[in-house]
């Protein structure tokens, strides 16, 4: 399949510990409902997977969506339905939010199937290291193990809510078992990648996420 430019949009949420679980469920449900907007090519939202050894800086939930163009992303961002969900369901329960957008060349379908596992890495490159980091990630994509069904990476073009993080990397796996098997069985490869990118980074955030089933249709 020929590579197609796709706009990646990822948002990390940190829900307050004291939040009523029903309000958290409402936030997730309403975020998932945004998949029905015409401009959205793919959208999934839910809790990040607990990983004590990962640098997630306390973020509890993730939204990942894809768009056919920057114009579609802009239309989503300003859509009244999206604005209402943010105002009514997100801001009242979250103590921290960050977001990143980048352009990715995908050579596989835009929508990640339900049950897929994702590992999202947000990187804050050292000064002057962004170009070298993205070039390194291009090599990582080429050498990705068979368990990885899709790799997306790129330089953030929306700095306002990114807290200085400038590069995103998203690896998609067939399922959670494949992701965990890679961690266990491909340690040399994982460490090799870390050795290449660590000198280029000021800091990074890593979260794992499982793509949920699509929201049930309403009649």
Predicted segment positions?
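A short mixed-secondary-structure module that forms the rim of ligand-binding clefts
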Residues: 78-82, 86
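A short beta-strand-loop micro-motif that forms or neighbors metal/cofactor-
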Residues: 89
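Short S/T/G/P-rich N-terminal loop/turn motif that feeds into the first structured element of a domain
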Residues: 1-64, 68-78, 92-191, 195-219
């Amino acid at each position: 399949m020929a590579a197609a430019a796709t706009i990646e949009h990822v948002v990390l949420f940190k829900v307050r510990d004291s939040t009523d679980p029903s309000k958290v469920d409402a936030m997730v449900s309403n975020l998932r409902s945004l998949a029905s907007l015409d401009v959205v090519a793919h959208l999934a939202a839910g809790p990040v997977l607990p990983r004590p050894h990962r640098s997630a800086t306390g973020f509890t939930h993730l939204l990942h969506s894809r768009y056919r163009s920057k114009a579609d992303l802009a239309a989503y961002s300003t859509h009244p339905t999206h604005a209402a969900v943010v105002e009514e369901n997100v801001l009242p329960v979250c103590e921290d939010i960050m977001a990143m957008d980048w352009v990715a060349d995908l050579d596989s379908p835009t929508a990640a199937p339900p049950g897929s596992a994702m590992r999202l890495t947000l990187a804050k490159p050292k000064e002057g290291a962004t170009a070298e980091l993205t070039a390194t990630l291009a090599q990582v994509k080429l050498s990705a193990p068979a368990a990885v069904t899709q790799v997306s990476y790129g330089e953030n073009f929306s700095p306002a809510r990114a807290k200085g993080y400038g590069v995103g990397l998203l690896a998609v796996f067939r399922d959670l078992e494949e992701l965990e098997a890679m961690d266990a069985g491909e340690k040399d490869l994982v460490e090799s990648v870390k050795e290449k990118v660590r000198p280029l980074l000021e800091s990074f955030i890593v979260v794992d996420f499982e793509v949920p089933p699509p929201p049930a249709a309403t009649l």
